[in-house]
């Protein structure tokens, strides 16, 4: 019986971090779920900047309220706290925080810190035990989590076509707060939540469409964002007026088998370590997993991000370079719905050369061991 229960529970746990949430309150049309996890995590690597303790925890809630029989309000917040640093250091941050309204079959609208629509497709390969999803990153235009997202989502195409979903999104500017990119004192480029240039963005729009049918899924997403003045200086490669992303993906999720692949082409949007952005980048991720009934889930994946005609900084000229390239082999074992353990081996295929050293890109292998309690 335990084996059968695990075979049903594990796929549900992989869908979303809140899938295993604990219901705190459910009365009179108001519902609040609490979810979280503690990951006792250790990295083994020759790269001393990552080797060692990586323990962290995440905590969040999802709430909704029934306003009318046609209208539902909702909100979500998720926070991460590092457990590998002394108490004197502030190592915690908000991952998502947004609120919205859902109008039955018409769709939903929300605003706040959320996931960009490009992640609607690229998330299909972001399922490795520890690594993965690194051909993009947070606060990277509309490719993953970011600030100031206004999102409209429609599920099952107005209730007419099961499995056909689409989204349209706008992101407001998140630029410098110091005024360093405002030489004329016009206020252009300044926002109230400033950050360094590598994590800035101008106004952007994007959209996604996905279709799922009997375990098969296909999806596509696009985004186009203005770039800030601070991003278009001689200090960085990859200057340009706009950052653009085009992605497509396929997946199969049935019969204990999970297969997914995505290809993304970006222009002035893929970060190249600390050097800036690739004028053009070709990103590819593929993953295969199998869920055994007794709780074991082995995983194998390949990820690559290749920058094209990267450009010049100072006296250095960079042409075509691999920004990221590795094979990932790992496995997760689920004791039950609340407890699991995993090992994940990142086999780095990058060469240690002048480019990787200039960009601060790691070229060493990493083995991750984790023990997870989630609720």
From Swiss-Prot:
Intervals, Periplasmic compartment: 22-33, 64-73, 102-106, 155-163, 212-215, 253-256, 291-295, 335-338, 375
InterPro entries found in the cross-reference section: Gram-neg_bact_OMP, Porin_dom_sf, Porin_gammaproteobac, Porin_Gram-ve, Porin_Gram-ve_CS
GO biological process: monoatomic ion transmembrane transport
Spans through the membrane: 34-42, 54-63, 74-84, 92-101, 107-115, 142-154, 164-171, 205-211, 216-223, 246-252, 257-264, 274-290, 296-303, 327-334, 339-346, 367-374
UniProt cross-references to PANTHER family, sorted A to Z: OUTER MEMBRANE PORIN C (PTHR34501:SF1), PROTEIN YDDL-RELATED (PTHR34501)
Cellular location(s): Cell outer membrane
The species this protein was found in: Escherichia coli O6:K15:H31 (strain 536 / UPEC)
UniProt name for this protein: Outer membrane porin C
PROSITE patterns: GRAM_NEG_PORIN
Annotated Pfam families: Porin_1
UniProt KW keywords: Cell outer membrane, Ion transport, Membrane, Porin, Signal, Transmembrane, Transmembrane beta strand, Transport
